Amino acid sequence: ACKWDSVIPFPEMWERLNKLIKPNGAIVLFGSEPFSSALRMSNIKNYKYDWVWEKSKGAGFLNAKNAPLKYHENILVFSLGKTANNNKNRMEYNPQGLVNEKRLRTYSEKDSNTVIGTRPSRKKTNYIQEKKGYPKTILKFNSLLKQIHPTQKPVALMEYLIKTYTNEGETVLDFTMGSGTTGV
């Protein structure tokens, strides 16, 4: 790691962020291993899931004889809110890229018993799927060819994440701002 890239002490960071965040707000942080594992475990209670940013420009060429080139970065999502559909404290999540589609779907409920285990039942339930194109965990955004800062993120990636976790007019805090991409 670079000298300027120091780890913010986790306990103090989470204490301050938990005072600032709305009950259903998201805290979205970038990191690579082994840092991302330490970050995740520092607040496993509020950890929700990861995205993977697939970069178009790799890193680690000086060590290519010893390890694979690195073409991704982890994006960790934390929240005081829940990730359940009908929970009143549901974390803000506005999936991007959805397409309207009213389509009748059917699923089989599951039966379970101690002898056979879980298996599909004969009971089928119909529902209407209203959208399609839900995001996958891998986000593909081109790396910047000319960077102001060594860890600079593409504006399009930051815009995607902001639109996913906030509503129009809400405030975003970038407390790890390097080159200021979030403010653009």
State each model region's role.
Residues 1-184:
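Core catalytic lobe of class I
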